[in-house]
Amino acid sequence: MISSEEKAKIKEEIVDKVNSCLEKNGESFRMDKVTVLNREETVKFMGSYRVYDRRKYGAVSREINSFLKKYGDVEIKSKKIRDSGMKFTTVSFNFEL
């Protein structure tokens, strides 16, 4: 099982990296937190972010996905959203350690 300090470090690392990538690409959305689900044998980390400029989605997702893969097998899902005239792509991810 991963210690509380390690969990906190991983959560902070992910939020910092995702927000840095979004800011670098001129995106207004910022990730607040990563959720942790403690299981009997493993710990599951889950989060999501948005990309508003669909032309930048490829570059943003490639950079973030390559960073997340350092934690192992990552499940990543994306969905295009149109809400009250706003268009964006929401990306959710999760992995277990």
Language-model features: where?
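Short amphipathic alpha-helical segments
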Residues: 6, 10, 14, 52-64
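N-proximal, solvent-exposed amphipathic alpha-helical segments enriched in charged/polar residues
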Residues: 1-32
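Short, non-transmembrane amphipathic alpha-helical segments
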Residues: 58-76
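C-terminal edge-of-domain segments
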Residues: 78-97
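Short glycine-rich, basic-tinged beta-strand/loop micro-motifs
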Residues: 27-55
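Short amphipathic beta-strand and strand-loop transition segments with alternating hydrophobic
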Residues: 31-36, 75-82
